[in-house]
Design a protein with these regions (language model features):
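Conserved class I S-adenosyl-L-methionine
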Residues: 1-44, 46-55
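A short, conserved alpha-helix within the catalytic core of class I
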Residues: 124-135
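Conserved Class I S-adenosyl-L-methionine
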Residues: 56, 169-235
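Short conserved loop adjoining the S-adenosyl-L-methionine
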Residues: 104-110
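Conserved beta-strand signature within the Rossmann-like core of class I S-adenosyl-L-methionine
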Residues: 141-149
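A conserved beta-strand element that flanks and buttresses the S-adenosyl-L-methionine
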Residues: 117
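Class I SAM-dependent methyltransferase SAM/SAH-binding core
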Residues: 56-104
Length: 235
C-alpha cells in the first residue's frame, strides 16, 4: 500500500483531496515548531520570500507577521483554501499567492529574491528534489532554505559553485496522526490508498492504533533535515 501512496502524493489532485487530512494532522502535532524557530533566527523583516509548496502557510504566515513580502506558491486548490482560511484567521491579507507549479514558473519571474524556501515539497515536483533544487539556484536568490524528511532512496543534494551551505541540521520529530473516531481512521487510509482497504490492511491499521486524550492515534516519527545556502556574493 505504501508504494501506491508514494506514487499518488506527487500529483496536485491528491493534495486537493488530502487537504482535510493535512489540516487534521496540523491540528494535533508540533512538527513545524523547530523549523519556524530556525527561520525566525535567520530571516529579517522586509525580505522578499518565495515559499514553494506553501500548504496552509505554516511557514509563510509567520514571515508575513514580521514584515516579509511573501509569495506562497501552491498549485493545489485544496491547500490554498487552507492557506486563505489561516490567513483570514490571523488577519493577514497581504500575502501573495501563486497557483502555478515550480515547473510552470519562468526563471525571470522570481529573480533576486532574499529567500526561496521549500518544506517537504521539492520531491513532489515533476523534476524530483535534486533537479528542482538546481533550478532554484538558477533563480539567483540570495538564500535558499530547504526542509526535507530523510527517506530511503532520497536523492543526494546537488552543489552549486555560486552558493555555500551555511548550515545543515538533522533531528527527530513526532509526526503522529490523531483521529476522533474509527470512521475517520478508515476514511483517511482509504483515501491514501485510493481504493477499498483489504481485510489484512484493516487488521494492520487496527493493531497500531493507540488511545490517548480521547483520540485514536497512529504514532509516527520522522527524521528531518534543514539546509541553508547563501549566495557567495550578496549585494
Amino acid at each position: 500500500m505504501e508504494q501506491t501512496i508514494c506514487h499518488r502524493v506527487a500529483s496536485v489532485e491528491f493534495w486537493d483531496g488530502y487537504a482535510r487530512w493535512y489540516k487534521l494532522w496540523m491540528e494535533h502535532n508540533h512538527y513545524h515548531d523547530r523549523i519556524i524557530s530556525r527561520l525566525m533566527d535567520n530571516v529579517e523583516p522586509g525580505w522578499r520570500v518565495l515559499d514553494i509548496g506553501s500548504g496552509n502557510g505554516v511557514l509563510s504566515l509567520p514571515l508575513c507577521a514580521i514584515g516579509c513580502e511573501v509569495t506562497a506558491l501552491e498549485p493545489s486548490v485544496g491547500m490554498r483554501n487552507l492557506l486563505f482560511a489561516e490567513a483570514f484567521a490571523r488577519g493577514m491579507d497581504w500575502i501573495q499567492v501563486d497557483a502555478r507549479t515550480l515547473e510552470q514558473i519562468p526563471l525571470y519571474t522570481y529573480r533576486n529574491l532574499d529567500l526561496i524556501m521549500a518544506c517537504n515539497s521539492l520531491h513532489l515536483t515533476e523534476q524530483g528534489l535534486a533537479q528542482a533544487l538546481t533550478r532554484i539556484f538558477s533563480f539567483n536568490t540570495k538564500r535558499v532554505f530547504l526542509v526535507s524528511e530523510l527517506y530511503p532512496g532520497i536523492e543526494a543534494l546537488p552543489e552549486s559553485e555560486d552558493y555555500t551551505l551555511r548550515f545543515s541540521e538533522y533531528y527527530e520529530t513526532e509526526s503522529s496522526f490523531a483521529y476522533h473516531h474509527i470512521g475517520e481512521v478508515l476514511d483517511h487510509w482509504t483515501f491514501k490508498k485510493g481504493e477499498k482497504l483489504s481485510d489484512q490492511e484493516l487488521r494492520d491499521i487496527t493493531k497500531i492504533l493507540a488511545v490517548q486524550d480521547d483520540h485514536l492515534w497512529i504514532k509516527d516519527n520522522a527524521t528531518v533535515g534543514m539546509f541553508w545556502w547563501e549566495k557567495n556574493q550578496i549585494s
